[in-house]
Amino acid sequence: MKTINHKEIEKFSRMAEEWWDPKGKFKPLHKFNPSRIQYIKTGVINHFKITSFKTPFSNLSLLDIGCGGGLLSEPMSRLGANVTAIDASKKNIEIAKLHLKKSELKINYINTSPEKLNDKKRYDIILNMEIVEHVSDLKYFIKCCSNLLKKNGIMFIATLNKTLKSYVFAIVGAEYVLRWLPIGTHDWNNFVKPNELNKICSNFNLKQNQEDGIVYNIFLDQWNISRDKSVNYISSFIKN
């Protein structure tokens, strides 16, 4: 079994050069990042009852799955985490390593997928941000992630709900009308409803900890955490 969807990997590999361009094809992720980082930071601090806030993730191991060019990996490292970041696209990892040279951060970037990660290590934190809608076998993917997470570890998943509204906003609006994303970036058939994701996770010893929506404020040009989960949502799970 495998989690890699080669069509998806080829699609993102073609855009790899633009990962760190805030006005390029990954502009939405750059806009998205502050909300994602704050959500993860707050979730980790609350779960592990952390009281040191300068580098709150110190002594915590973190696995960023589907890391792309490292847009989340680098901020996680700055928070003090011992970061391993993986991506099935060789081109993405090359871009991430190249950008890493501009910083003084230490991140272990590996061109692989969770089921092929040759690592006996188990992680305190796992990030699956905007990745589950691009894998070939979601159940197997979640199983592999659970196997890599320590007991009482926390995993974050951000993805798209499978609703009519998500089709209108995330595909028709974002790809065809506003051109925020290249046409074909998303396949609505691969979107997953929160209750379906929760059920899959529960089958692999992952208990939902928190679930929220993320919405775009057109007037402020920023993304915010919200109760509205009809399009984008983010969840955290604790391993039993």
Where are these regions (language model features)?
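N-terminal, positively charged/glycine-rich alpha-helical extensions of SAM-dependent methyltransferases
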Residues: M1-F26, H30
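Short alpha-helix
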Residues: W188-N205, E211
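Core SAM-dependent methyltransferase catalytic element
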Residues: Q222-N240
